[in-house]
Amino acid sequence: WRADATETFDFYAFNIGDYMGSVEQSVSSETISKVLYPNDGTSAGKELRLKQQHFFVSASIQDMLRSLDKREIPVEEFPDHWQVQLNDTHPSVAVAELMRLLVDERHIEWDLAWEITTKSIAYTNHTLLPEALEKWDLQLFKTLLPRHTEIIYEINRRFLQVVRLKYPGDDSMLSKLSIIGEEGNKSVRMAHLATVGSHHVNGVAALHSELI
């Protein structure tokens, strides 16, 4: 996929002497798909990486939906025609993006949208070390993807209701399994999101899968 600006050249900015500003939108948009996996040691790098993850996930899922439309296949049959394999956590925002597209764009009620989503997504975990699992600062995530944040909170609310029934009175289990990390600055735990939103989770080896 390639990212392009909706407006490649700003004539107004150019005419008032803002030559850099006249192409700023074009350069900023093209950067999303030009170089993958930027150094995320800076705020700008983190922001670009999250934009990239969402861009490629959204473009791919929308293309899958378009393919169903072209063949006049009901969106409810999405899992019968497409399976989304999350190879590690980088594309995990697919869980929230597919829900957004189904609920907001296709006007499907939540429970059916969740059934379609979980039947369509599988996740391969690459590490069990908590410090190595991808997390996004909640404020950054909310700023760039406000609707996805709302959807993730609703997914988490419903998931934790199930956890409470299974582990009544165990607040530590709720904290451990929550998609939203509460320690320090709040974060979105992408491995948790991928696990909750998948019909199958595996590791990269048999022992790894058993440990998961």
Where are the language model's segments positioned?
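A conserved ligand/cofactor-binding region detector
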Residues: 1-212
